[in-house]
Structure formats: C-alpha cells, structure tokens
Amino acid sequence: MSGGAGSASGRKLTAGGTTGEPADEPLDQPIDEHCRRRPAEPLRPYVAWYTGYRQRGVPPARHRGLPSPFLTLIFTLDEPLVMLAHPDPRQPPGDFGALLGGLHSAPALITHDGAQSGIQVALRPLGARALLGLPAGELAEIDVPADAVLGGVCAELRARAVAAAGWRERFAILDEILLRLAGPKSPRMPAPDIAPEVGWTWRRLLACGGTIQIADLAAETGWSGRHLTSRFRTEIGLTPKAAARVIRFDRARHLLARQARSFSGAAGMAGGIGGTGGIGGTGSTGGTGYRLADLAVTCGYFDQAHLAREFRALAGCPPSQWITEEFRNVQAGAWLFEGA
C-alpha cells in the first residue's frame, strides 16, 4: 500500500531522524513532518525503508494507498489508522492500531481528521517468510491487524515507540525488534527456502521495470509458464503478469511525481497541473515535466491511452487527478513520492 497512512507534506527531517520532537512547539502551531531511514544492514534483504510521520492541526484529508512492490506494515503512535476502503472491496472498512497489508493491484483509501502519527515499514516480498513467518502470498490483496501475524511484538513496539524521544530512537527500536524476529533466536519456525526460480523472477521483474514478457521469464527459469505462475503467486501473492503490471505502474507514478515536484518549482507552470502544458497534460512542458505520451514510452506502455487506462485501474483515477489530489505533497517533496 504505497504511500502508507498519510500524506505528510510539511518539513522533511534528515535521514537520521531527530533526537526528539521539540519540547517548545506552540500548541496551536500545525505540525506536518516526515522522516525516512533505511533499516540496519542485516535487515535490508527484508526491509526497504522506514518512514515516520506526524501531523497535527492540518486539514482533514483522504489519501490513496497505491499498489507497489512492497508489503506495508504500519504502527500508529496515537489515533488508529482509518481505512475507508481496502484493495479488496469485499473487506469492510476498519480502524487499525497496527496494520499489515500484502501486495495488491487496486488502491486503498485512507482518511484522517487532521491528526495522525506513526511509522510505516516497507517489507520486501521475498523477506516475508523471515520476518512474518509466512509467505507474502498469504496476505495478497488484504489488510489485517498486524498483531494477528506478529503477536505481542506489536504491542511492545508501539509502547516503546510512543515513549521514545524521537524518530532516531524509534527507528532503532524497529531495528532491534525486527532483527529479533529474523535472527537465529527467533521463536518462529525456520522459514523454508524460497525456490530460486521464484526469487530470480521477482528480481528480474524489478530490474526491468516490469517490461519483460512472461513467456520469456518462464523460458529463462526453465519452468513452464503455468508452473511459474502457480509457484510465484503462492509465494509473492500476485501472478508474474500482475506483479509486472504493479511494478510498471509504480515506476510510472514515481517518475510522474518526481517531475511534478520539479515542475512545481518552475516559473510560470504553463498550463498548470493536468493542463495541456503541465504535468499530466499533452503538450510540451519545456523539460520540467513529463508528457504522458513520453512517460508511457519510458515505462513500457503501448501508448498514452494504455498508461491512462492502467492508472485508472490501479490508482482509481486518471494521472492528472492523482497529481492534483497529491500536489501539496509534491510541493513539499513529501515521503509519498520517495520510493513509497
């Protein structure tokens, strides 16, 4: 669920985090911050990054949690995470103190009333067995209370994170607890090895941005297409074709967002967001933004119409609408657009 709990769009803290939130912040001063850090070195095969977010006194908002190549683990530090809609529409809305979500091919819808804080962990699908004790495939297209999988670790982590002095300490707590889960003294049963062909296929898809033909993947593994699809879906949660689609979309929307962030600082912003000269539009942007036709070619779509259809299917809206909805994040360079 890319983008996680919110759309923190205010001050961006350093990669190392802060030693603590300022003690003298005015009570009526809006707070809107985020902080990102990579996990400890031994965790990097399993975890891509941590993001801390804190908002107070900001306008209530809704946010789209978009498909991405990562499982999502969120620990709130105050108010529950309010899910208005899950990727699977059959799953009812709900509130979560800690949420774990698998790979998905449809957007989620998250809301807050102007106050939220928490930590998002981006989990690599091939690391799910080591950290969660189950394959990523068991979480495909669903969100679950994280304690249903991780048990009492969730309560421990949340309690310690709430009491911590700041983001640096919270991320250190995450490192400690996740290393405990993945380490040799973990109470979990040893994770069975993932078939090399499955791991290779996932890494190949990531490396090519989801543009390789599935028949070529099967030929390279030496498996039949049907066998590869079955084994891959069991482990990862999506078929190779669906995974390629998500990876391709994730690349496209990040390129679009990065260009929009750059474009927002350009003088004039001719055409504006979604206009004929602006981000998401069809005309020239003078090098400061992507035309959708160019973006489609770069990311391996047949044409602009193909990209637009895929965006509607995976984001629930056209590219221009998504950029418009998230533009305050683009202006601030929020964590939503930095690998989320």
Predicted segments with their positions:
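Hydrophobic side chains within alpha-helical segments
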Residues: 306-307, 313, 329
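Alpha-helical bundle regulatory/interaction domains
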Residues: 1-225, 235-242, 254-266, 271-274, ...
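DNA major-groove recognition helix of helix-turn-helix
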Residues: 232, 244, 311-312, 323
